[in-house]
A protein has these predicted regions:
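Short alpha-helical elements
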Residues: 1-168
Length: 168
């Protein structure tokens, strides 16, 4: 194995924060933000071509997905294709992927004047990341955030990912 995985998929999910999760000092320590669903944390993830999580990061629930995308991509290591939804359609992200030698399989937003073509057959595999979120949210500790500190909640998510995907 060369260490380069073929495809990677990226996405984020909202997790509702229980009322007991509030109270840690500082917004960064909490990673809890107000969104339409109330107080939430957002878990950002990048999965490999087998649907196994490679990188998981937290942010406040009101942060948009693309603001964490560069950090996920940098932490992931080399890959050939990145599959993402329309929320990740930005020129700066496409440039970052081109610099890394990766193909962007991202549909264009409707506001883009000249839509950029993408591999629609490869895009069908993007559901790997959605299936990963469903599997991780089977763990009660991941589905609802009860921890005050972001680092404690992230540890719970990483432990659930390890149990679900890496221990066999």
């Amino acid at each position: 194995h060369s260490g380069i995985f073929d495809g990677a998929a990226i996405d984020a999910t909202h997790v509702k924060a229980h009322r007991s999760a509030a109270g840690a000092k500082g917004a960064f320590a909490q990673a809890i933000g107000r969104s339409r669903g109330g107080r939430t944390t957002k878990v950002h993830g990048l999965v490999d071509d087998h649907g196994r999580p490679r990188v998981l990061l937290l942010s406040a629930g009101n942060i948009n997905d693309i603001s964490i995308a560069a950090a996920l991509i940098q932490a992931a290591g080399p890959f050939r294709k990145l599959l993402a939804d329309k929320g990740y359609d930005a020129d700066h992200l496409r440039r970052l992927l081109a610099e890394r030698g990766a193909e962007a399989v991202i549909p264009s937003t409707t506001s883009r004047r000249a839509p950029i073509p993408y591999d629609t057959l490869a895009y069908k595999d993007r559901n790997r990341v959605e299936r990963m979120w469903c599997r991780l949210k089977d763990f009660r500790r991941v589905a609802t955030r009860y921890d005050k500190l972001a680092r404690n909640y992230l540890s719970s998510v990483l432990l659930a990912a390890t149990c679900a995907y890496w221990l066999k």
